[in-house]
């Protein structure tokens, strides 16, 4: 029998010490693993494996959050060990949540696949109330263009006017020119913003505000439809807010490079090229994004290969965009950020315009030397300094902005006045915005938000001729406006909103002389300048009920305030004192009702609106130039939109918008009298239908096909000379097809191909038709391609 060894007391003591020490070490390691900190990293992609940048990733119940980078990569450090629930969200995709087991001193890799969101009601916007809110709580019509949608449309054309016309119901068709005259929103003027900085020049509307920045630096576009005063002067039909990209906080250094070529498929000298470069990252508390873009277009030709008239054309144009955004996080709740953007677009054409015959043959370009200054926007500078504090006191958060905008553009030669000449608009804006938001409960289960603050802006605008003559005098406007918005949610589903804004506007107008009508100053009127003071209290109210997905209704009433086109009134002055001119403001009352619906795979929405103003600003042609017709106006219309998921990889959708407007010339309250008129087509666009098809059934490939139909509008007769006045020419319907294909070659490498006017249709844009003149009877683009290659690193 085997004898077991006998342990001495000393040996037993050593074993006890050994096992005791091991147990302590093991317990310590286990405890540290449970209480230490680890890292979560990974990538955010869509169902095709395409990277999703700027997705918001946060650890629930922890004050930890970050944003995915351009390649979809992200990293969360100092995450407490144990089971942690992460939440990932971004506009356009369903929210994603997952429990992750975090181990101390270790990195957990998580790959996140987001499903494209079919309902827009979960989108979060900031432009409607100047605070984050979901569309399901917004009692108004809103269109949001996500980064993905911008990228798809940019693959066809980087012209923002084109992108928006295909994407926004109620917005007029693009002009295919440098400007956006006639591209109104719901039949009224739209206020365009870049990160809340006004781009529009309502004192002397120049029609250069939609194309005022390059889409490569835009993260998303928010379009608020219907009159609003939330951002101040000029939003009679609504507002368009370009929200610029954020710095990538997922890595210390990264970038995106893109190069491409463009051109027509018929005719020579059409090839152009485009380059853009972005660098971004985060180091400690500092983050940055720097971007540059250069584009040179070739000759633009129509479907028959004819050179499109260079008058305000986009052919042979050089465009530049420089963008910088720097941010510093003092604490997780305090941030200072500075943004600067430079945009310039100038035409250098070797062609002259040869007039067409209205209704018969197009105006085209012929070889020749153009005299005078090159047309285009010389510069558009925008700078914004923003400070945010998510808890400045109590539960109140603060956003404060100082901004600056400087704009200068030159127009083509005009013969509408004696001596002819080229005009230029200059506009400089300086402003401050202070916005506070305080949440609280007014009763059990009744949360409320108070949003309040102050806007201050100085706008100096003038219009001169390049030969030194003054057409519109310097107008120096100071706008001081406190505001208050309140929002309460009852029984979790009924949101009621209301607000007011007090407008205080003072405008100093210099003494000036109107342009002469003959030699030696004949016909010029010396007008004594002075001060114009405007004060108004404007309101908004609305309600939305979001309990049922199949029926989510809203109603709203909103006012806007606008000192619009004062410059046109001044330059057409027939009196020698300011007080004798019609300079009253435009106050618009907008009434709207609509609903959104989700039933299975179908999304559907509709809205009807009706807006009135006692004094409008319908532009009327007199002796070849515009004057403002100050008469009561009514504008009304409706919009419908539908999307349907046919298969997992196939969806279709579309929208239809129609608007009409009338003016009460004799001011008798009856808009259907013999003297009353339809508002011309510079204001009221023809009906517009768009249909899209999206297919992603082939690995790494997405395909988008778009169809647009611009309808008829024929409301006016010719004058005694048998000609149409500007804005009154009949518009005949036309149809266009575009297609975009994006192929993810590798994870960092992407190939994009877009074709505009796929069927090479001969057509005249709406502006070419309603202008009713030989020189403006210009065809739209023939079949054009846009081929680009992008690389993320």
Regions found by a protein language model. Name each.
Residues 608-612, 629-719, 759:
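Gram-negative outer-membrane beta-barrel transporters
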Residues 397-415, 544-546, 552-564, 582-636, ...:
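Membrane-embedded beta-barrel scaffold of Gram-negative outer-membrane proteins
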Residues 77-78, 162, 197-225, 277:
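Short acidic/polar hinge/loop motifs at secondary-structure boundaries
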Residues 268-297, 302, 306-350, 442, ...:
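Transmembrane beta-barrel wall of Gram-negative outer-membrane proteins
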Residues 289, 329-345, 374-519, 544-546, ...:
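Face-selective signature of the C-terminal outer-membrane beta-barrel domain
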Residues 215-256, 792:
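A beta-strand signature from Gram-negative outer-membrane beta-barrel systems
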Residues 161-201, 219:
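Extracytoplasmic beta-strand/coil segments of soluble accessory domains associated
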Residues 298-303, 561, 652, 709-718, ...:
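C-terminal beta-signal and adjacent terminal beta-strands/loops
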């Amino acid at each position: 029998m085997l004898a077991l060894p006998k342990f001495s007391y000393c040996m037993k003591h050593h074993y006890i010490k050994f096992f005791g020490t091991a147990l302590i070490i093991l317990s310590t390691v286990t405890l540290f693993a449970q209480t230490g900190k680890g890292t979560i990293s990974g990538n955010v992609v869509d169902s095709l494996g395409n990277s999703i940048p700027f997705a918001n990733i946060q650890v629930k119940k922890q004050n930890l959050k970050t944003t995915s980078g351009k390649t979809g990569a992200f990293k969360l450090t100092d995450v407490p060990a144990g089971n942690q629930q992460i939440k990932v969200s971004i506009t356009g995709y369903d929210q994603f949540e997952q429990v992750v087991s975090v181990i101390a001193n270790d990195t957990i890799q998580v790959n996140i696949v987001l499903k494209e969101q079919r309902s827009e009601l979960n989108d979060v916007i900031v432009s409607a109330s100047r605070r984050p809110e979901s569309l399901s709580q917004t009692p108004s019509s809103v269109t949001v263009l996500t980064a993905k949608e911008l990228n798809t449309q940019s693959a066809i054309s980087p012209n923002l006017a084109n992108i928006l016309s295909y994407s926004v119901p109620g917005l007029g068709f693009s002009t295919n020119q440098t400007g956006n005259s006639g591209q109104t929103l719901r039949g009224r003027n739209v206020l365009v913003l870049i990160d809340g900085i006004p781009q529009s020049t309502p004192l002397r509307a120049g029609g250069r505000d939609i194309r005022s920045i390059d889409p490569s630096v835009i993260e998303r576009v928010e379009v608020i439809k219907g009159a609003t005063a939330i951002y101040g002067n000029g939003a009679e039909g609504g507002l368009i807010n370009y929200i610029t990209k954020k710095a990538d906080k997922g890595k210390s250094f990264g970038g995106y490079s893109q190069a491409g070529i463009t051109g027509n498929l018929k005719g020579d000298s059409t090839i152009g090229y485009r380059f853009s470069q972005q660098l971004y990252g985060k180091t400690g508390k500092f983050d940055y994004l720097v971007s540059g873009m250069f584009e040179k277009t070739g000759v633009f030709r129509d479907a028959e290969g004819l050179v499109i008239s260079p008058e305000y054309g986009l052919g042979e144009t050089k465009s530049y965009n420089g963008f910088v955004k720097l941010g510093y996080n003092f604490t997780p709740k305090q941030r200072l950020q500075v943004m600067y953007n430079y945009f310039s677009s100038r035409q250098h054409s070797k062609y002259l315009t040869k007039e067409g015959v209205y209704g018969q043959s197009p105006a085209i370009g012929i070889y020749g030397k153009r005299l005078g200054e090159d047309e285009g926007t010389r510069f558009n500078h925008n700078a914004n300094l923003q400070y945010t504090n998510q808890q400045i006191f109590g539960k109140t958060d603060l956003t404060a902005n100082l901004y600056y905008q400087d704009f200068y553009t030159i127009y083509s030669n005009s013969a509408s006045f004696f001596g002819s000449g080229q005009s230029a608009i200059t506009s400089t804006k300086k402003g401050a915005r202070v916005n506070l938001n305080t949440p609280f409960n007014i009763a059990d289960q009744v949360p409320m938000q108070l949003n309040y603050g102050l806007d201050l802006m100085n706008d100096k605008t003038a219009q001169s001729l390049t030969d030194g003559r003054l057409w519109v005098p310097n107008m120096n406007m100071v706008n001081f406006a406190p505001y208050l918005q309140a929002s309460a949610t009852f029984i979790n589903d009924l949101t009621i909103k209301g607000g007011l804004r007090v407008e205080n506007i003072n405008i100093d107008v210099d003494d000036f002389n109107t342009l002469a009508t003959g030699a030696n100053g004949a016909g010029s009127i010396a007008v004594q300048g002075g001060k114009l003071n405007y004060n108004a209290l404007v309101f908004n109210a609305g309600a939305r009920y979001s309990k049922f997905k199949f029926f989510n209704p809203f109603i709203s009433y909103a006012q806007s305030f606008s000192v619009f086109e004062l410059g046109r009134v001044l330059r057409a002055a027939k009196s020698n004192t300011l007080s004798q001119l019609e300079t009253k403001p435009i106050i618009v009352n907008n009434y709207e009702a609509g609903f959104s619906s989700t039933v299975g795979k179908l999304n559907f929405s509709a809205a009807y609106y009706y807006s009135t103003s006692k004094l409008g600003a319908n532009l009327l042609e007199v002796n070849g130039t515009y004057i403002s017709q100050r008469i009561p106006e009514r504008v009304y219309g409706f919009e419908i939109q539908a999307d349907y998921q046919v298969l997992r990889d196939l969806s279709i959708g579309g929208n239809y918008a129609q608007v009409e407007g009338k003016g009460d010339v004799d001011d008798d309250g009856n808009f259907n009298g013999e003297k009353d008129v339809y508002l011309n087509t510079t204001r009221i666009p023809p009906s517009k239908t768009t249909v899209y098809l999206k297919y992603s059934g082939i690995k790494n490939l997405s395909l988008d096909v778009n169809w647009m139909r611009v309808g008829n509008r024929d409301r006016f007769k010719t004058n005694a000379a048998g000609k149409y006045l500007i804005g009154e020419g009949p518009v005949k319907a036309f149809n266009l097809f575009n297609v975009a294909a994006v192929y993810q070659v590798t994870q960092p490498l992407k190939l994009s191909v877009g074709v505009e006017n796929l069927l090479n249709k001969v057509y005249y844009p709406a502006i070419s038709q309603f202008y009713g003149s030989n020189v403006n009877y210009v065809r739209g683009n023939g079949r054009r391609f846009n081929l680009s290659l992008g690389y993320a690193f």
